Every structure is written in C-alpha cells, then in structure tokens.
A protein has these predicted regions:
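A compositional/structural signature for long, glycine/proline-rich flexible linkers
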Residues: 20-414
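N-terminal signal peptide c-region/cleavage motif recognized by signal peptidases
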Residues: 14-16
C-alpha cells in the first residue's frame, strides 16, 4: 500500500471515529456520535470493550451558557471529559466530582446507596481553559462546582466525550437512565434541546488532526520494521512494560526516546484522565501463547446491582488486547469482576490467537484468556498485539497502582 493510501485511510479513521451511520443504540442531536465500544462499528482510539462512549462536537457562541442535566447511571463509573483537536484530554468531570440535585443521591460517593431512584445532577460547560489542573488518575480533593471546561480549538470547535464504565447487569449501554439532556441560555432565552443543537451546530464535522486517533500507518510500519532491529521489534521476551505519557514517549517504545517530564495521558487517542495506563507489545514469533500472572487490585463490586458503593484500592481495572498504534482497534477486554482469582488474589491470563487458546484457559480452571487478532497489528504483521492495563482513580495509600509509577525506570519496583 502506498503512502497516499495510508494517509487516506487514516483520514477516514479520523473522520469516522465518532460516526454513527448504521450503529445501533441511543443517541440524540447533541450526543450524536456513539454509542461505540469494542464493536465492529466504531472500534478506534483504544476503547475498553466494557465501556460505552458518546461524543458531542459543537461550537458555543459568545455569551451562550450550556447546561447538561442527567441522572447518574447504574454503573461502575461515569464522566464527561473535554478534548483538544489532537485528541488530548483537557479536563475530566468524573461522577464523584458532581454534586447531585437537592434531595438526590450521588451513587458514586463512598458509602452511598447505588440504587436510590433520586439520582439527578446538572452541570455547566464553559468555553474556556481550566485555571487549575486536577490530579489525574487519583481521587481529587478539589471541588468542581459542577463545571466542565471545554475550550474551543481550530475552527471554534469543542469536543466532549460521555463515558459509562461497566453498566450494571442488563442495563447496557446507558446504565438504566437516559442520555443527559441539554439546554442553552442565550440572549435572554432558554432554548430546548433541538433549538440548542441548532445554535451549537452539533451536527458539524469533526475537525481534529490526522494523528489524534492513531499513528499514521506508514509511520507505524517504519517504526516497527527498522533495518537494524530484530523482526520482533519492539516486543521482548519477557515483555517490557511502558506507562502512557506523551506522544514522544509513545513513539519512544520504538525509538528509546522517552520524555519522563511529560504529564500522564497526553499522547492523544482520547484517553481518560481518571485512568493511568500500562502497556506492552507482544509478538507471537517468541511463542504462540503469552502467560501473565499478577496480584489483582481490589475494586468495588457493582455489576450485579450491589446496593452500596464501597470505595476500594481502585475504582476499576481492566486488561485489553489491542491490535496496534497503527489502527488502535481493541480485540477484547476483561474487567476486574470477571477475571478469576486464586485464593491469594492472583490472576493468570493467557493471550493467544484463538487457534492456540489453551484448553484450560477458562474460568473453571482459574485462567483468563484474551485474543490476538487473526491479522495481528492490522497493518502488516500478523503476529503483533498490544496488551494494556487500565487503573482508575487509585487511592493515595495504594502503593501498587500504575499511578504510583513516576517514570519508566520505576515500573519494576512498583
């Protein structure tokens, strides 16, 4: 495939990252892009297959006030996060930062009922940059005042993404609530949803940079097939792990050039500021099956409609098999509650193509399994996959979180 074809393919990906044609699921004139997850419709920018995503792209006129009103979902987590034109996060307004309406309950506050029917909230979106940066990946002590900062980029465009992680059993994708509603106050009038969408131009095309959703396939192929590197590059056996920093450090997996001063999760691909990520590249040329074993962090139990939210070491963790930085597709993910653990809290995970799945890689034998795609990285190497762990909202006193890794050199110690 020539360079022009690769460029056109990435352009198509960027324009279709939040496309909706033919995608089943709820949406409206504002939340018009989604829902997407680890599905065949819109599988891009490393989605977690246990999460549902909706995006809104809009432009607030000067003097307009945008309010979003909704109900907290029956789920593990929800947030609304703003992004720039390169797919980098600006601010996360996570569930626990949102004050509920009067007489309502926030089901994501420690010790609160998860099942209370009065669970409404209302937030305000501002077209300006935040003056203070909240801590990422951990529970912030600062208040949000129910405000999300979503500054415009490029052609006066703003983008926010609404996430619902792990809806309770039988409630997907929205967690047994409706999509958040919007209203705009403008020039002394309060506009309804349809009027607001028209004013905000919420049907406009997405105007993001070509590399916001992934590394250009031509560049990816060049990085992964350097003439002075082995054919397995950059995979190693045993695997070498990398935290997510900026785009330079992502490419550093292939070049060795890391920016340890970079803030976390600033490399694009629309990451969640409440997660920190750890990943490795694997290659089947070392063997058909990769076995990983580790101690599982403790998280709240929610999937089976548990009545009370009890804070734990992490809010959520998962492990995913992805194709590559060249197409950013997810093969599948496993979330904390579904991963079998032994009596000491350790998990064992096998990763392989389906034809080489070990016969004992089933829950009854205590071994989890994730697939490698039949076409590998989806670009040129059928043997490649990315394995990625997510740790969400770690407690400060939990020393073994990905959040505790300050730089690449600390990974083994943590």
């Amino acid at each position: 495939m020539n360079k022009l074809s690769f460029t056109l393919m990435l352009l198509f990906f960027c324009q279709s990252i939040f496309a909706v044609n033919g995608v089943p699921g709820p949406r409206d004139c504002f939340w018009s892009r989604g829902p997407h997850s680890g599905d065949p419709y819109i599988n891009l920018a490393y989605p977690d297959s246990n999460v549902f995503y909706w995006a809104a792209t809009f432009s607030m006129p000067d003097g307009a006030e945008l309010n979003i009103k909704g109900d907290f979902p029956y789920a593990r987590y929800m947030s609304i996060i703003s992004y720039d034109g390169q797919g980098r996060p600006i601010e996360s307004l996570a569930d626990y930062l949102i004050e509920p309406n009067k007489k309502a309950v926030n089901p994501f506050s420690n010790g609160n009922s998860r099942l209370d029917q009065e669970r409404g909230y209302e937030i305000k979106v501002l077209n300006k940059a935040p003056t203070d940066k909240r801590v990422t990946g951990r529970i912030a002590s600062t208040k949000s005042n129910n405000v999300l900062h979503a500054p415009a980029y490029g052609p006066n465009q703003q983008t926010i993404i609404y996430r619902i992680y792990l809806p309770d059993r039988g409630t997907a994708p929205l967690g047994n609530v409706k999509l958040p509603d919007i209203k705009v106050n403008f020039e002394g009038k309060t506009l309804d949803k349809d009027q607001s969408c028209k004013l905000l131009k919420s049907s406009q095309s997405l105007a993001i940079s070509l590399d916001a959703a992934g590394i250009a396939p031509m560049e990816y192929r060049k990085l992964a097939s350097q003439p002075d590197k082995p054919v397995t590059w950059p995979a190693k056996n045993p695997p070498e792990w990398y935290i997510q920093l900026d785009r330079q450090s992502l490419i550093g997996i292939y070049t060795g050039e890391f920016n340890n001063d970079a803030p976390r999760s600033t490399g694009g691909f629309f990451p969640n500021l409440d997660n920190h990520y750890l990943r490795t590249i694997v290659n089947r040329k070392y063997g058909n099956v990769l076995i990983l074993r580790g101690k599982a962090p403790n998280t709240p139990n929610t999937f089976n409609g548990d009545p009370k939210y009890i804070e734990n070491e992490l809010r959520y963790w998962s492990v995913c098999s992805n194709q590559s930085f060249g197409n950013t597709r997810v093969n599948d993910c496993l979330y904390d509650e579904e991963i079998p653990l032994d009596e000491n809290g350790f998990f064992t995970l096998a990763i392989s193509k389906s034809e080489h799945r070990p016969r004992n890689a089933i829950d009854d034998c205590g071994i989890a399994w994730l697939p490698i795609a039949e076409n590998g990285d989806g670009v040129f190497d059928d043997d490649v996959a990315i394995v990625q762990f997510r740790h969400m909202l770690a407690r400060d006193n939990f020393p073994n979180s990905i959040q505790s890794v300050e730089n690449q050199g600390d990974i083994k110690a943590v």
